[in-house]
From Swiss-Prot:
It is found in: Nucleus. GO terms for molecular function: DNA binding; zinc ion binding. It comes from Mus musculus (Mouse). The gene is Znf473. PANTHER family: CHROMATIN-LINKED ADAPTOR FOR MSL PROTEINS, ISOFORM B, ZINC FINGER PROTEIN. This is Zinc finger protein 473 homolog. Interacts with the SLBP/pre-mRNA complex but not with SLBP alone. Interacts with LSM11 in a U7 snRNP-dependent manner. Keywords: DNA-binding, Isopeptide bond, Metal-binding, Nucleus, Repeat, Ubl conjugation, Zinc, Zinc-finger. Involved in histone 3'-end pre-mRNA processing by associating with U7 snRNP and interacting with SLBP/pre-mRNA complex. Increases histone 3'-end pre-mRNA processing but has no effect on U7 snRNP levels, when overexpressed. Required for cell cycle progression from G1 to S phases. Residues 23-101 form the KRAB domain. Residues 66-97, 134-203, 297-370 are annotated as: Disordered. The keyword Zinc-finger applies.
């Protein structure tokens, strides 16, 4: 519909049937604070550009589509261009609004713009105007009469009852005085162009704004601008469209910058570019570590509420405002600071009598958001900081008492959802089952993660070592190995771990909680992996076999370690004696022997890296090769250090001689003790008489006590009558798998370990080491009572039972006692009638191997025992002893 010229001259600019879509002046508001403009003072081109942007929008409001617009980047002087703009508007007969508006009203507006007489605060916004002009005091402002009633200056549209659209200003701001003699009626628009265009585009699904880079279309122009930021280089498509003259039919919002300087501010640290210096300063706070965590809204509101009324035309700015505000065009944020901080509060004060009324409507107060990298919430108990209050509340539950307990196991939790998730582990769901390996899971997400193993997908790769992982969380845990980060620390011993699960499993060592139990032998474990490894021994799943000696193993690493035996030399060599070892841990244990024997500086210097792993006790000469064993050994000295014998008055160190010295002097046997079931039977430093120390771990069957849980577990194997480990060659059964492995080596024909002195071969390296001590004459284990030395510690223990008279092994059939378990085993064959050893010549069976060997000498004629006087030889040692009595004339 066309509009008459007399209507325009009369000031009726907003008729209900308007064909042309106008923008509200509010959409042109660009609010900045003084701090923002100070950052842009050095860039005078930016000031000129913002003037050009404002004038161009006003020309779009009051001109026609075929009106040529002046260039935005070619205006040397702002005031000259403003004056020139008011006179360069052409006349077009095809437009009904040209003559009246362009000649009179628009020329008046341009004249007021150029002369600086227009009250911009009533049109644009005081925050934007003061920050735009720099110094608020340097702008000449007209005086608005306080005596005039606001109702006298209302527009005809407002009086006629027309409902305006988005309000641009209050009705008191309807009069904009250019001078006391000259007034200009403002434009009160019914709807803004952005609102109309948005409504039309939604109804018609039109997307007129198209990106020239990728061809994507948008219904709103600001969406196109936000999309263009994704393209790393080049100028905005809006500028290219305007340069080609293609934007006259559609309105594009203006960007706060020219195409040449769209992203002219570059960060020196990371190379990121920004369109304004204030955004660059916000971004640089990430590199400097500066964190503005305190919300300024409360302090701003308090400061503004107490501030006195300002004079008309003066600027209202809070002194507490310290954060810049990005420019807005058409109500859209052109760019947001990297820290995620919201815009400052504006128009917080209410209008006072005599004050100039506010232009824009007050907006609700919004707090600034905390930066994403800031941690402003601190726990009062442990001092740990968090970025949000929710995370702090979640962390504080860890300090509180755990309330949720699982009904199926002793596990407790501090969150109900964790307890619910744990309870599902006791009832696995059949729906979440892997079709490849038939493994079931409690959650579908766990099934999806597991299926990635079968697919072989490892998208997450470590930059340090190149190792790939299935999940990003696994990669983060792996990267802690390179960085050395161990955030999870044990409160009992101070040991740190990379993963929380490792800390949980470690804490079970202090608490003694072993939730994983073997259903076959009832043995408990504190880790599920240990239980899985243990159950493989019951199943006898030995998939890895040696190609040379046909020996089988459960794990692949055991086979790799075994293959090193067939090599000529071991990988690790001792620098002191030249002995080779397959494992480094075995070499470290061997080096501890040299360190105990020779404490010279030369030995310590040559093995400096290994001596750190050897821990020596200051009270005795015992030096275990691990700190854990040293800590267990030092507990003996902490509780019991020495004792005194009443009959003889002799003092002794019970850590070195743990056998009860009083029973030796008095001749009291352990069977005569008041509590024979608690008497010790060996020289282990962890098992003492109850008069010296009270162990904490007790056996329920024999009521026997032990100091360490491992000793109790080893003792409980005696009560287990079942022998699940059977030999396939001779059907012999064993209680432990290691005994079966040692036994199976006797059936193999190869003996890989050969003695270099006598050429004798052995199945195990430990047997060879014991045998070599015979040639060297080394007997490190010495009896403290008679001074007799032995090669091994087991021989010393058996010998010391002669002095104490201890016979802990009792036959259940006849009650006979024995000092050694092997003697009890041989004795039990009398009751059972078992004779496992058979002569290969005559088929005679024997209960003991020694008797079999003696019998075989009859068939072979071997006589190894010869008399030293007459040279006569005998097949048995007893026959030689009887013959020697002839020469000595001794009577039996």
């Amino acid at each position: 519909m066309e509009r008459k010229e007399d209507d325009l001259k009369g000031g009726c600019w907003n008729q209900p049937a308007v064909a042309e879509e106008f923008e509200t002046l509010k959409d042109l508001a660009m609010d900045f604070t003084v701090e923002d403009w100070k950052d842009l003072e050095s860039e005078w081109d930016q000031r000129d550009l913002f003037w050009d942007v404002t004038l161009n929008h006003y020309q779009d409001m009051f001109s026609f589509t075929d009106t040529s617009q002046p260039s935005l980047t070619s205006q040397p002087d702002v005031r000259e261009e403003l004056e020139a703009t008011s006179t360069e508007v052409p006349e077009t007969k095809s437009s009904p609004l040209q003559s009246g508006f362009v000649e009179e009203d628009f020329s008046q507006i341009m004249e007021i713009f150029s002369n600086g007489q227009l009250n911009f605060e009533a049109c644009i916004g005081e925050d934007w105007l003061n920050s735009f002009l720099g110094d608020p005091e340097s702008l000449p402002r007209p005086d608005i009469s306080d005596k005039e009633s606001p109702a006298d200056h209302q527009s005809p549209e407002s009086k006629s009852g027309l409902s305006p659209g988005p309000p641009l200003c209050t009705r008191e701001d309807a009069v904009m005085s250019a001078s006391p003699e000259k007034t200009l009626t403002p434009v009160i628009l019914k709807e803004s162009r952005s609102d109309l265009s948005q409504e039309d585009s939604v109804q018609g699904h039109e997307k007129p704004y198209k990106c020239s880079e990728c061809g994507e279309s948008f219904s709103q122009s600001h969406h196109l601008i936000q999309h263009w930021v994704l393209h790393t280089s080049g100028e905005p498509p809006i500028w290219r469209e305007q340069q080609r003259g293609l934007s006259q039919g559609a309105h594009f919002p203006m960007c706060p910058g020219t195409p040449a300087s769209y992203e002219s501010y570059t960060c020196q640290e990371c190379g990121k570019r920004f369109s304004q210096n204030v955004y660059l300063q916000w971004h640089q706070k990430i590199h400097t570590g500066e964190k503005l965590c305190k919300t300024q809204s409360d302090s701003n509101l308090e400061g503004l509420s107490r501030s006195p009324s300002v004079e008309p035309g003066k600027q209202r700015l809070s002194k507490d405002t310290d954060s810049a505000k990005p420019s807005t065009i058409h109500g859209q944020d052109q760019e947001k600071p990297p820290t995620g901080e919201s815009r400052d509060q504006e128009n917080l004060h209410e209008s006072q009598p005599g004050d100039r009324p506010s232009v824009l409507h007050p907006k609700p107060l919004r707090h600034q958001k905390t930066p994403t990298n800031a941690k402003c919430f601190r726990c009062k108990k442990c001092g740990e900081t968090f970025s949000g209050a929710f995370h702090l509340a979640k962390h504080q539950r860890a300090h509180a008492q755990r309330l949720y307990k699982c009904a199926s196991c002793p596990a407790v939790f501090n969150l109900s959802k964790h307890c619910f998730q744990h309870r599902k582990s006791h009832f696995p769901s059949a729906a979440c089952e892997c079709q490849g390996c038939r493994k079931s899971f409690n959650w579908r997400s766990s099934l999806i993660k597991h299926q990635a193993i079968h697919k072989g997908e490892k998208p997450y790769k470590c930059d340090e070592c190149g190792k790939a992982f299935n999940h990003s969380s696994t990669l983060k845990i792996h990267q802690r190995i390179h960085s050395g980060q161990k955030p999870h620390k044990c409160s009992e011993c101070g040991k740190a771990f990379c993963r929380r699960t490792d800390l949980t499993e470690h804490q079970r060592v202090h608490s003694g909680f072993r939730p994983h139990q073997c259903p076959v032998c009832a043995r408990t474990f504190n880790r599920p992996s240990h239980l899985v490894r243990h159950r493989l021994r019951h199943a006898e799943e030995r998939h890895f076999g040696c190609a040379k000696c046909k020996e089988t193993f459960i794990y692949k690493e055991q086979l790799e370690r075994h293959n090193k035996i067939h090599t000529i030399e071991g990988l690790y060599e001792c620098k002191q004696c030249g002995e080779h070892f397959i494992c480094r841990s075995t070499l470290n244990c061997h080096l501890s022997i040299h360190i105990r024997e020779n404490t010279s500086e030369k030995v310590v210097g040559q093995n400096s890296q290994h001596t750190e792993k050897c821990f020596k006790n200051t009270k005795c000469r015992k030096a275990p090769n691990h700190s854990r064993y040293l800590g267990q050994h030092e507990k003996i000295h902490a509780q019991v250090t020495s004792g005194e014998c009443d009959p003889c008055g002799e003092t002794y160190d019970q850590s070195v001689q743990p056998i009860c010295h009083q029973s030796i002097c008095a001749g009291v046997k352990p069977s005569e003790c008041a509590e024979p079931e608690k008497c010790t039977r060996n020289t282990s430093a962890s098992e003492h008489h109850p008069s010296q120390r009270e162990p904490s771990f007790k056996c329920d069957i024999y009521n026997r006590a032990f100091k360490q849980r491992a000793h109790l577990s080893k003792h409980q194997l005696i009560h287990i009558t079942e022998k699940p480990f059977k030999c396939n060659e001779c059907d012999r059964a064993f209680k432990q798998s290691n005994y079966l492995i040692q036994h199976q080596k006797t059936h193999t024909a190869e003996k890989h370990f050969e003695c270099s002195e006598c050429g004798k071969t052995f199945h195990q390296r430990s047997c060879l080491s014991k045998h070599q001590k015979i040639h060297s004459g080394e007997k490190p284990f010495k009896c403290g009572d008679c001074g007799k030395a032995f090669i091994s510690g087991a021989q010393l223990i058996r010998h010391q039972r002669i002095h104490t008279g201890e016979k802990p092994y009792v036959c259940q059939e006849c009650g006979k006692t024995f000092s050694q378990s092997s003697c009890l085993t041989l004795h039990l064959r009398i009751h059972t009638g078992e004779k496992p050893y058979t002569c290969g010549t005559c088929g005679k069976a024997f209960a003991q191997r020694a008797n079999q060997r003696k019998h075989e000498r009859i068939h072979t004629g071997e006589k190894p025992y010869a008399c030293g006087l007459c040279g006569k030889a005998f097949g048995l040692r007893t026959h030689l002893q009887q013959h020697q009595r002839i020469h000595t004339k001794a009577k039996p």
